[in-house]
């Protein structure tokens, strides 16, 4: 169940912007890319696991050693089936700047990258200018057209689906002991998905949002200060 804390003008404005971006026909010159990140706990086995043998299941000890945490940036171009995974030591402004630089390198011919992301404080131009300088960071940022999801609206970011796939298909219940292993496994998972060209079939658009939340788009114009009679909060019992 997805819950919206407050359905106000700002929330609807940003939601409509993101959904409008998803509704655009596929255009390789303006790819729509969704980006998000997640922490990953690192665990090492205390005793070597026992592999499967004829008539015996694989076994591993319940005891493990904590090795701290890492971070994974996940990006996906849903319409093209392109997947990107960048494990990093942490989630910092410098790491974000490096990831954005690498992302833009994958689209050298794009007029702009329509980038969907949340409102995390490092998801901004300043992260790039602090790391790359005003000129270099500004140049990279200008390759993007950012679309921010509203607060408590992370469900609008298709990168959340990508993270879920990564967690289930790549990480699973395995123990990842270090960043090197995480990067190796992430690259292998990326290659499999990109070879298969796995796309995301997103079906929740602006018409569905207006029907689900019961608002009229014409009542939400921030410049006019109009207030809608739409409910202040709503839960999506089934999504999409």
Task: Identify the function of each model-found stretch.
Residues 34-36, 75, 81, 100, ...:
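Mobile genetic element proteins and their domesticated derivatives, centered on retroelements
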Residues 15-101, 213, 220:
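Extended, low-complexity cationic-aromatic segments
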Residues 1-13:
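Short Lys/Arg-enriched helix C-cap and helix-to-coil transition segments
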Residues 94-114:
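Short, basic/hydrophobic alpha-helical segments
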Residues 80, 159-178, 192-196:
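Active-site proximal helix-loop segment of RNase H-like, two-metal nucleases, encompassing DDE(D)
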């Amino acid at each position: 169940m997805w819950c919206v804390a407050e359905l106000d003008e700002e929330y609807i404005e940003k939601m409509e912007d993101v959904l409008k971006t998803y509704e655009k026909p596929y255009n390789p010159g303006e790819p729509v890319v969704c980006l998000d990140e997640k922490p990953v706990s690192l665990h090492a086995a205390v005793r070597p696991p026992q592999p499967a043998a004829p008539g015996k299941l694989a076994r591993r000890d319940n005891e493990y050693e904590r090795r701290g945490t890492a971070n994974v940036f996940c990006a996906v171009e849903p319409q093209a089936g392109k997947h990107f995974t960048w494990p990093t030591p942490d989630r910092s402004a410098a790491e974000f700047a490096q990831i954005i630089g690498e992302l833009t390198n994958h689209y050298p011919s794009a007029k702009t990258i329509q980038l969907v992301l949340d409102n995390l404080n490092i998801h901004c131009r300043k992260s790039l200018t602090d790391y790359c300088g005003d000129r270099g960071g500004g140049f990279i940022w200008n390759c993007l057209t950012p679309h921010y999801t509203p607060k408590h609206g992370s469900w609008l970011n298709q990168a959340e689906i990508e993270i879920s796939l990564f967690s289930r298909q790549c990480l699973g219940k395995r123990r990842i002991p270090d960043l090197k292993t995480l990067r190796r496994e992430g690259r292998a998972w990326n290659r499999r998905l990109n070879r298969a060209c796995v796309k995301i079939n997103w079906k929740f658009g602006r018409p569905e949002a207006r029907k689900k939340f019961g608002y009229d788009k014409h009542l939400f114009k921030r410049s006019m200060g109009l207030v809608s009679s739409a409910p202040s909060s709503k839960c999506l019992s089934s999504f999409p």
